[in-house]
């Protein structure tokens, strides 16, 4: 994967070849993500490492090396197993509930179907923010990412709504496009989540609780402290 830190043309726009290269990089990312997630239990690790790669790309203009990515994936597999199982269980229960309501097999009718669909969309938006946050901490610290994302969703509901829209659009496109294109869509979706999250920063109160790094204190998360004027 190439660097995106190329010069722009005289009109202030990037050259179309650079844009095409970025699109190809994201498509490759989606394909690799899908292959790594194929065993199911490695799905969370694959998503987290892909998010970490996009995080590096958007911050530095370069993709992480294959060695660094494989090292991240190896560290993220075991912590990601319960996350993969939980995500699969929640998705399965919501899908079964929506199917039963749509078919009229359970009481509630259209109102219950609409409420359940809204709950599912909201959870998908929250999951999208968790994916963005876990990418910022190396791709494997899901518990810290989940706590921070919950605070961010409550304190910045517009960003939560925006991320919900991204996940809903991605889900719709996944249904409409040919199955072969779904892995490519996965890479674009991760990039879109990062783009929307970076353009709608959380409120200062949430940012002050965000974990900064795990490189000190024996690998435990260190939280940023609000600046004192």
Each PLM stretch: what is its role?
Residues 1-116, 124-229:
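Helix-coil boundary and N-terminal low-complexity module in membrane systems
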């Amino acid at each position: 994967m190439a660097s995106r830190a190329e010069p722009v043309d005289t009109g202030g726009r990037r050259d179309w070849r650079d844009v095409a290269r970025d699109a190809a990089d994201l498509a490759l990312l989606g394909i690799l993500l899908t292959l790594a997630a194929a065993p199911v239990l490695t799905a969370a690790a694959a998503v987290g490492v892909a998010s970490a790669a996009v995080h590096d790309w958007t911050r530095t203009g370069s993709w992480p090396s294959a060695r660094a990515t494989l090292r991240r994936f190896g560290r993220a597999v075991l912590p990601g197993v319960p996350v993969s199982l939980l995500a699969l269980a929640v998705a399965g229960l919501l899908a079964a509930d929506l199917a039963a309501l749509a078919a009229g097999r359970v009481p509630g009718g259209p109102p219950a179907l609409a409420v359940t669909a809204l709950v599912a969309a909201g959870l998908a938006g929250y999951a999208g923010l968790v994916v963005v946050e876990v990418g910022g901490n190396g791709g494997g610290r899901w518990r810290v990412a989940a706590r921070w994302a919950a605070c961010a969703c409550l304190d910045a509901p517009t960003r939560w709504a925006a991320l919900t829209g991204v996940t809903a659009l991605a889900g719709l496109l996944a249904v409409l496009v040919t199955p072969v294109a779904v892995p490519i869509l996965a890479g674009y979706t991760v990039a879109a989540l990062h783009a929307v999250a970076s353009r709608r920063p959380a409120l200062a109160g949430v940012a002050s609780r965000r974990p900064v790094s795990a490189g000190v204190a024996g690998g435990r998360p260190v939280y940023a402290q609000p600046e004192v004027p």
